[in-house]
Amino acid sequence: MVNVPKTRKTYCSNKCKKHTMHKVSQYKKGKERLSSLGRRRYDMKQKGFGGQTKPVFKKKAKTTKKIVLKLECTKCKKKRFQTMKRCKTFEMGADKKKKGGAVY
């Protein structure tokens, strides 16, 4: 399980050129465009009779995805992405575990 704080002091390579506070959030994939060429080509191919025209991928190998963090500088608002290792569970800004604390 990975717990990441909501703010982090790290280097800003834009105008700041120094370590500043960054707002941390998890990267999410955007909405797919219906007008992109590949999508239009696929939709045209799927039209009419003949069923599924391209193979549907079934040999999934990975059980987890790599976590991608979006870091935004609080001073200049520059955004950058940082990849982390693979993990099953991911938390943002949860309370830190204390040594010798009660386990429920």
UniProtKB/Swiss-Prot annotation:
Domain of life: Eukaryota
Pfam families: Ribosomal_L44
Any single biological process term in GO: translation
Places the protein is found: Cytoplasm
Keywords, in A-Z order: Cytoplasm, Ribonucleoprotein, Ribosomal protein
Gene Ontology terms, MF aspect: structural constituent of ribosome
One GO CC term, this protein: cytosolic large ribosomal subunit
Primary location class: cytoplasm
Function: Component of the ribosome, a large ribonucleoprotein complex responsible for the synthesis of proteins in the cell. The small ribosomal subunit (SSU) binds messenger RNAs (mRNAs) and translates the encoded message by selecting cognate aminoacyl-transfer RNA (tRNA) molecules. The large subunit (LSU) contains the ribosomal catalytic site termed the peptidyl transferase center (PTC), which catalyzes the formation of peptide bonds, thereby polymerizing the amino acids delivered by tRNAs into a polypeptide chain.
Assembly with partners or alone: Component of the large ribosomal subunit. Mature ribosomes consist of a small (40S) and a large (60S) subunit. The 40S subunit contains about 32 different proteins and 1 molecule of RNA (18S). The 60S subunit contains about 42 different proteins and 3 molecules of RNA (28S, 5.8S and 5S).
Family: Belongs to the eukaryotic ribosomal protein eL42 family.
Name of the protein this chain belongs to: Large ribosomal subunit protein eL42
Species name: Plasmodium falciparum (isolate 3D7)
